[in-house]
A protein has these predicted regions:
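Nucleotide-activated donor-binding/catalytic signature segment of Leloir-type glycosyltransferases, i.e.
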Residues: 54-55, 238-256
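A short, well-ordered alpha-helix in the C-terminal region of glycosyltransferases
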Residues: 324, 331, 338-352, 359, ...
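Acidic donor-binding loop of glycosyltransferase active sites
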Residues: 266-280, 293
Length: 397
């Protein structure tokens, strides 16, 4: 089967899936990048020094663009991860010929549904593929199906998807033994580690972690909190730490490469994910679960309803409810065995289900089934299972 993946640029989040697809298709896989990576992303360590041969930089020249278009037209199936009319024209010919095509998208109403803009938006999404019965939706957010259903598009044609960063396989017992709580077990005051990582910007709410630390310290908990990242809120966070006298329990480590962040995840007991509904997916959830962290995450994050089963492989708190967040973190700090169990189940979720190899296998199975006109309910859960409509208020504490 010939497969083409079209996206803005090639990065470390897409590499594992692309490698798996290239292997499974015996080299009949191409990744079409339509633009140069932004300087901000390059500075975050997202750039690949040596791009695989299957990556086509269609923006480099007319010859490259023509080559990409030929591959797109000839492919058995295409994954289209872009928006806008200009980009949509890349798959227009396929859709006219009723060739199997998938679009993948995060949610489109991150900032809420606005009735006054609805008629124009609905028409736009209907014109840009929503009307085409051969175009299916890979939902890179648990809220994608809900958002597109409001426009009347992709009804009963939505599948669970996401981002699939590198999956690491560990000796789980050895890794759990490296967590700070395990290493400090013999200390006079055993200590648990809490990690927060991401850009220090409003939608990610890093300030919530500092108020949490203040509440935990006041109640006498022994912990060390690390905050990784930089951004517009950095000085504000430093000031909060100073004002609340939290220098002894919080460290701000600045920006790091993805590999360095993973090392910190491997040593962390608890991972905090505090973003709001503007967080389309949140690949740090995959990575922290893969690292055996007991994750406490906002219900608003796109990846959370797909990846986390509350109280089984992670804890969910109601977005914006800092008291509920504190309660969930205290549950983990109060019971090391429960915390360890949550971390182990999180690791299993990524190793057994939410990884690039499984996603690639399932995608090809789904594509072949759809090409034959067979039923598309092939999987009960996980990548390529039917994506149900999940509303913003699905979780209440």
């Amino acid at each position: 089967m010939k497969v083409v993946f079209i996206s803005n640029y090639f990065n470390h989040h897409q590499a594992p899936f692309s490698e798996a697809m290239n292997k499974l298709t015996n080299g009949n896989y191409w990744f079409v990048a339509v633009e140069e990576m932004s300087e901000e992303r390059k500075n975050m360590g997202w750039e690949h020094d040596d791009l695989p041969d299957y990556v086509i930089k269609s923006y480099k020249s007319k010859e490259s663009l023509d080559y990409a278009k030929r591959k797109i037209d000839e492919a058995d199936t295409v994954i289209f991860g872009l928006s806008g009319w200009k980009n949509f024209k890349l798959i227009q010919k396929r859709l006219r010929q009723k060739k199997l095509t998938f679009r993948y998208s995060e949610r489109i109403y991150k900032e809420g549904f606005k009735w006054h803009r609805f008629p124009i938006q609905a028409l736009k999404h209907w014109l840009v593929g929503g009307r085409c019965s051969c175009l299916y939706m890979l939902c890179a957010s648990a809220y994608t199906a809900q958002d597109y259903a409001k426009t009347g598009c992709y009804l009963n044609r939505t599948y669970e998807w996401g981002y699939f960063p590198k999956t690491k396989r560990y000796d789980i017992d050895e890794m759990m033994g490296k967590k700070l709580s395990a290493r400090s077990a013999g200390w006079k005051h055993p200590c648990a580690s809490i990690l927060w990582a991401g850009r220090l910007i409003g939608l990610k709410h890093p300030d919530v972690s500092i108020r949490l630390a203040a509440a935990l310290k006041e109640k006498g908990y022994s912990f060390k909190m690390s905050i990784i990242g930089n951004g517009e809120m950095e000085q504000q966070l430093h000031d909060m730490i100073c004002d609340k006298n939290l220098d002894d329990c919080i460290e701000m480590l600045g920006a790091m490469s993805p590999d360095e962040v993973r090392k910190h995840m491997e040593g962390a007991d608890i991972y905090l994910f505090t973003s709001d509904f503007n967080e389309g997916w949140g690949a740090v959830l995959n990575e922290s679960m893969n690292s055996g962290c007991a994750v406490v995450a906002s219900h608003a994050i796109g990846a959370v309803p797909f990846l986390i089963k509350d109280t089984v492989n992670g804890l969910v708190y109601q977005n914006g409810d800092e008291c509920h967040l504190e309660m969930q973190v205290r549950r983990l700090l109060d019971d090391k065995n429960y915390r360890n169990q949550i971390g182990r189940e999180a690791y299993k979720t990524i190793i057994n289900m939410w990884n690039a190899d499984n996603a690639a296998n399932r995608f090809l199975t789904l594509a072949k089934s759809l090409q034959k006109g067979n039923g598309a309910d092939l999987f009960d859960d996980g990548p390529c299972s039917k994506a149900q409509i999940i509303k913003n208020n699905w979780f209440t504490c």
